[in-house]
Amino acid sequence: MDTYGSIKRDLKYMYDVEEVFRNTIPKTYFGIDDVEDLHVDEAGISNIHNNITLGTKKCYHLYKKGHRTQVPIYLGSLVTRESNEYEDVSYSYDNLNTIYKDAPVWEPLLNKVSKWYDEGWSVPSSKPIPYDPNYSKCLILSPDKYKKYHKVVVDVDYDAFHWSIDVNSEFMDMPNVIRAWDISTIPQFVDGFPMLKHLIDRSKKEALFYFNYRLIPYVVHNIDKDDDMWREWLSYFLHGDHFKPDRGSYDNFGSLLGHKRLEVALMYHNRIRLMPMSATALDAMNEGAKFLMKDPTYHTAVMKKYNGVLTQYGMAEPLGYNRGWGYTGVTTADSPFILSNVNGADGYTVIDREAVEEAKEIGMQYTPKLVKLQLANMTKTSSPVNLIDSLIGNAIISLTGFAGSEKVSTALDQFEKENFERKVPDELFTAISNVTYEMVRESFQPLERSMLDKRTRLLRLYNAGTSASSSAPPGARYIFNKKMIMYSTFLSKSIDVTDEYAPMSFITSLNFNNKTANILTHPQNYYMYDWHDNHNRIINSGSREVRGGRATRIITPDPPSNYMLLILGALNTVRDMGSHRTGFSNLGMNEVVGSSFLDAVSHDALAPQCLATSSSRSLCAQALDYSTWDRQQGGRIAEAKAHGIMRVANELFPNTNTNLSDVHNLLELPMSSILYLWSESIKSSYKYKIDHSTVAVDAVRSGELTTQFSNHVTNLAALRQYHETYNRTKVPQGFRPIEVAQINIVGDDVNVILRTADRKPFTLRDMEGYHNHTFEKAAEYEFSISKKRSMMSNVATEHIKQYFKMGDILLDVMLSSMTSERNTFREQGYMNGINLLYDIAVTIMARYAQNDKLFEDMMANLPFMEGVVYRHGSQKYHFHPSPCHLLGSGSPEILPSAIDLRTFARVITVLGDYESDLYEAMSSLNATLLSTSGTTQFESQVRKHLSEELGDNIISPVWSEVFYRDEVGYEMVTKHNKLTPEGHREYLVDRIISTLSNREKLIMNNADIIEKLLSGKLKKVKRYFQEIKFKMSNMPITGLPDRKIEGVSELSSPYRAADVGMRRVHKCIGLSRRNLKFPSVTERLSRLLKSYGLVTQADSAKILSAAAGLGRSSTRYRNLGTDLGLSDMHASSFAQRLPALLTQYEIENASGSFTFYDTVSRTYDVSEASMNERVGDVSNNPIARANSSTSTYYRFRGMLHCLYGARFGLSLHASVE
């Protein structure tokens, strides 16, 4: 294959995309017809007024000449316009006039529709949904009645309380889910209660719709009057159900959920563009979208009642088997999969027929096409289309995006205690205690891990500031109200400055209510442990939304000092849970794999699930689904965990008397006392503020450090009991002995691989006997476990939204790049947004979408991004970078035909001078777009305000006990005072300031970016490596050979529904096992400084930045080392090691050379062995140096060429010409 010919075609395609983009941008800003090319080389900041007509609607295409060829290179388009001013517009159609009066932002769409009407087009009106009077009967309006009704409510703010919802009311189904009721049918008041206002407020809070693009232009340019789904939406919108959008907030004039109906239409079109589904599935998707559009959030909740059961049984009892993975390889440390190319033997699934029948009966009333598809899919065999079809129900319920539920009622449902005292038999109590003991005791091996002096404890707290596992206390925060922040702009720097274009300013409130800031200013809030205060304090709760109609999740963080307690007593345990390496010998060792894996990908970490659902019939998988697991962890179960912790304390540490009524200094408390306080905190309840209520939570708290550990312990203990009692009680009754081969537990999610003791195939009777015993035992323990959502099978299984069907892996399909949970996407800056969209794209690629479709979708959506936005008075400036900026460093650096190969695009520089100019121009553009000069301005002014109001008192003096120099009277040699122990206070002030909101920083950064663009002063980027040409030759495939199904060859990758190019790489090169790692230079420096025993407040990136400015001088490097606090011996070693680190630092800053692995590429075999096999000696390249990072770099670039060829089905070898 001529890879370079393909690369040239990719580049030609990018030029075509760029041309379409350049023509599209002005059309997305309605009324802008004036377009002009502007060559920024010739502009200069002093001539901006002469080059830009301020205050007019115009689009400037910006160009800059390449320094080699002097050919102008398109940078992007700058749109200038005034803020929206709407004039009176009159239409010949009353409905359009009504919409314009309420929401004039829709004028471009209304103009379009008016022309359609003129041409004879029409759309019928959809029937609105009237208000249900029974809703008022579901409201609790008396705070006293409300408090009495809910046992977990310990207090009510009588002034704030106006209403609550009875979730289990007999009068109405799911009253806590907001409905799409016609606003005109909702009474203003019901018995004095302001019903209309109440429901409108609910819709704004609960029915979220944060679109990642500019909504109106996106709709106008993508709408099709003849498309069935667009017509469905227009049947609502044009007949009264319109709304006014305003950056995530919506004023509805028809129904309460007009905006969610539009979201369904947008998400539907995105799904059908990207998902290669069957015609039957497309019909089901169309049917489901129309059903959801009628009443988006409620109908999503209705679909959840039947979709889950029918989805999990997809391909559960197929009529044929065509997959077989070899047992060899999965039980060793070798390649995870050996394809047998044999038909799988018959397998079985324990199916809850009653649950299937119930789901069928419900679903046939609403989405019969979907239900028929799902029922038919149960007997189908695995294929790419069938796999995707099996998850169409999930894809449908995700069309409503983030649709939560009423917060207080959700919280009460989440935390409400059962009406009985849970029975915890001694055998379960002992099992929970044993698991807790094992995990905690192991975390203190060797015992030195528990030896924490005061300095080490404070250092743990310092490094824990970025975690979200605790709340900041309500007091001890600095709030500076109404501080003036000035920022100069390209306007104010122009020659003739009038008042209209004077320097800008804004008034902002600076709120330091942030955990990092609080730790640095008031660490005593964390290390002074007051049991009485913790349990009487009212803690603010949080919340998050989840796709697919699931209820709002309430987050309950720890009190600050309890957080500190856990990072001292439990941090090792939590870390150990998350640091298991996958091992295929698990199948022989009965090893329990913890909550997560190092470097894990599905085919590696969960290979036994693939094996158990394909050819090895002596294995099967059992997946259990617990309901409200968190709230089942209180009472005697919590006591069992506390008992296990105290067994460790009593065994390993001297006994101490710890009084709960005392206030304890955690910096000095012995480990036995810390474990005692941890054990007591597990058994106790905490109070959380949720709107108008204070709720007591005595179960596992969702925002604490040990949430997953605590859920894991009970899950594992119960699982052991299910298994042990089965073999003890059921085997004597004639059932076969069963062994546990592997357990995967993540909190309340469990998937266990079971094996017959005699290694003979499972029968259906074996599975049913074991599965039924599990539920009998769970009922005995009074665990709430859903039988209809649990399954036992050696054909299909599921673990944490990863589906395994006949050995194939299918990942969840709910992810989308169209909407976000919060408005943060638009507030994070353009380049961060681009990188996030890219990450989502490659994740979807590994699940169901094809490369070409994904790239086309990204390019089609690019003109509708916000771009770099800057406002000055009534004027707005929008800069939209060229699509070619995705080729340059600082972006993913991708080519259209291989978006999974991050950084590969720099290969274009070997094609010629123009291509080199293009790469450098796009890299400079990206560096400019990533500029943080505005942030620097902002933070320097904030620092001045802090100094004026607080002087030197902002940082707690306790940090001087952590960051100090042993040597007395040391005199600094370099100028980098903030990095030294003596300068730690200044450094920590900077760290506090960095926690402030991004909004002000973004405003100032954008002003600076547009100034640099218009002046032609883009940031220069050094290319550390020059790309070289490789000679490509054919070699035998080393990956998974094709399998034959009914005589037809087919790719055999386990990711069978994923992008075909990805699967070809698995064939030609192979699946990943232990890929080559490229540790970042900051990671390497951190390890080096730690080996020297240095305790410093400075992060490695800032140290490297300081060193880079010293010039290549070993004396200066040694001086920097001593300034940091190193001994003379270590400073000399530091000076010797630093040049190599600085080389890598320059490489990473210049080109991000070693940033490669993403969701897709992580599955490719890029191991040392694979590279040795596929890439020849690069040392004969004059640019490379043996045994250096340059050699590694060029070997990796050669491997990228091999991966690129493999995407097209070619197994290649790369050598240097």
Curated annotation (Swiss-Prot):
<comment type="function">
    <text>RNA-directed RNA polymerase that is involved in transcription and genome replication. Following infection, it catalyzes the synthesis of fully conservative plus strands. After core assembly, which consists in recruitment of one capped plus-strand for each genomic segments and polymerase complexes, the polymerase switches mode and catalyzes the synthesis of complementary minus-strands.</text>
</comment>
<dbReference type="InterPro" id="IPR026381">
    <property type="entry name" value="Seadorna_RNAP"/>
</dbReference>
<comment type="similarity">
    <text>Belongs to the reoviridae RNA-directed RNA polymerase family.</text>
</comment>
<dbReference type="GO" id="GO:0016787">
    <property type="term" value="F:hydrolase activity"/>
</dbReference>
<keyword id="KW-0378">Hydrolase</keyword>
<dbReference type="GO" id="GO:0000166">
    <property type="term" value="F:nucleotide binding"/>
</dbReference>
<keyword id="KW-0693">Viral RNA replication</keyword>
<dbReference type="GO" id="GO:0003968">
    <property type="term" value="F:RNA-directed RNA polymerase activity"/>
</dbReference>
<dbReference type="InterPro" id="IPR043502">
    <property type="entry name" value="DNA/RNA_pol_sf"/>
</dbReference>
<dbReference type="GO" id="GO:0044423">
    <property type="term" value="C:virion component"/>
</dbReference>
<keyword id="KW-0547">Nucleotide-binding</keyword>
<keyword id="KW-0946">Virion</keyword>
<keyword id="KW-0548">Nucleotidyltransferase</keyword>
<keyword id="KW-0696">RNA-directed RNA polymerase</keyword>
<protein>
    <recommendedName>
        <fullName>RNA-directed RNA polymerase</fullName>
        <ecNumber>2.7.7.48</ecNumber>
    </recommendedName>
</protein>
<keyword id="KW-0808">Transferase</keyword>
